[in-house]
From Swiss-Prot:
Protein name per its UniProtKB record: Uncharacterized protein C03F11.2
A Pfam family recorded for this sequence: Lactamase_B
InterPro entries registered for this protein in UniProt: MBLAC1, Metallo-B-lactamas, RibonucZ/Hydroxyglut_hydro
Gene source species: Caenorhabditis elegans
Length: 362
């Protein structure tokens, strides 16, 4: 069976977060994921957190590509006592980073997790919801495929309503990012059902008061929405007045398996420069109904040509690998390295391969 699903990456104040990864057997989607990460000039070893929205095989399977990350998943997925419980074990919301929360949103499975990304100036609050929503069409249906395949459709409906009433945009499990419309909010009966929940939960810092006026903002074209963000009340688009400009971008391609099967890689960058309409050459298809594109990555003007690598480990690579290893608080001396995972050696090997590929291409 060929399974594909959305893979997301969030950058928040020095933290790289990957949400879901392709199936272990989906080689094409794995390559797309790694290409998407590389497009941000980072390597998998720099990812600090990996969140699995639920335990179905099309949403996890490539976690081994992130050896330095902390992994978050439902407690039912792993029952080994060596795993550490988090706030989500006793609470509905866990603060992962300054602008990112993990929400308990059971429904599709008993252990669904939704990643709430706050203060994205182009889009307000973005919910990375896994299969709680399959796609935009599914979000408008009272009893669609989500209802038929849900672990508990009644609980699932409650979780979906929570997300609809709180977020401005949703990245679904199998489709393009879409905005939450006023029609969706009306169908979820937001004011009567969800405002009380927010008041009772002290962890949630935002409120649904923006709902009266958000529609006039999100109906604008994406470029207008972003460029006019400074003139809009930040209370209802979810951005503080001092926040940096942000961007959300999508990389979408059709897999070799089927003309109708797509895998989507989204990046929500909370510290990006003001987006332009330009994008890197890995954007293949239409960007209709998406927020503004991020800035194309430019080569640093102070870039220094390094000598070609010869031998197993070039001294410059070895030196840089040690600095990277130190930043990641990995062991430095040989005795510690022999006892623990050899992250330093992996960095040396990875950097050597990357540099040789660069030299061959240029």
């Amino acid at each position: 069976m060929n399974l594909t699903a959305s893979v997301s990456m969030v950058y928040d104040g020095g933290h790289y977060i990957v949400v879901d990864s392709p199936s272990a057997t989906d080689v094409h989607s794995k390559e797309l994921m790694l290409k998407g990460i590389a497009s941000r000039n980072i390597v998998p070893g720099e990812i600090q957190y990996v969140v699995t929205t639920h335990g179905h095989p099309d949403h996890f399977g490539q976690g081994n590509f992130f050896p330095n990350a902390r992994h978050f998943f439902g407690s039912y997925e792993y029952s080994d006592t060596n795993f550490i419980s988090t706030e989500l074990h006793t609470k509905d919301i866990m603060q992962l980073t300054k602008n990112v929360q993990l929400w308990n949103t059971p429904g599709h499975t008993a252990q669904d997790v939704t990643v709430m990304v706050h203060n994205v100036s182009c889009c307000g609050i973005i919910a990375v919801a896994g299969d709680l929503f399959y796609n935009e069409e599914d979000a408008n249906e009272a009893a669609g495929i989500w209802f038929q395949e849900a672990w508990n459709p009644i609980i699932g409906k409650i979780s979906r309503n929570k997300v609809i009433c709180y977020a401005d945009y949703v990245i679904p499990g199998h489709g393009k990012l879409f905005r939450i419309t006023q029609e969706m909010k009306n169908g979820a009966d937001c004011f009567t059902k969800y405002e009380t929940t927010l008041d009772d939960n002290k962890t949630v810092q935002s409120s649904p008061q923006f709902q009266n006026s958000i529609e006039q903002v999100i109906r604008k074209p994406a470029e207008t929405l972003f460029s006019s963000a400074n003139s809009v009340s930040f209370n209802y688009i979810g951005s503080p007045s001092t926040s940096a400009s942000s961007s959300t971008r999508a990389i979408e391609t059709t897999t070799a398996y089927s003309d109708s099967t797509t895998t989507t890689f989204y990046t929500v960058d909370l510290t990006a420069e003001t987006p332009s309409t330009l994008e890197s050459d890995i954007i293949f298809n239409s960007q209709e109904n998406l927020p503004p594109l991020g800035m194309k990555i430019k080569k640093n003007a102070n870039y220094i040509e390094l000598p070609d690598l010869s031998g197993d480990v070039h001294p410059m690579v070895q030196s840089f690998a040690k600095k990277v290893s130190d930043v990641l608080k990995q062991p430095q001396n040989e005795a510690e390295i022999s006892k623990m995972m050899p992250h330093l050696k992996k960095w040396q090997t990875t950097l050597t391969k990357l540099w040789k590929q660069y030299m061959n291409a240029n």
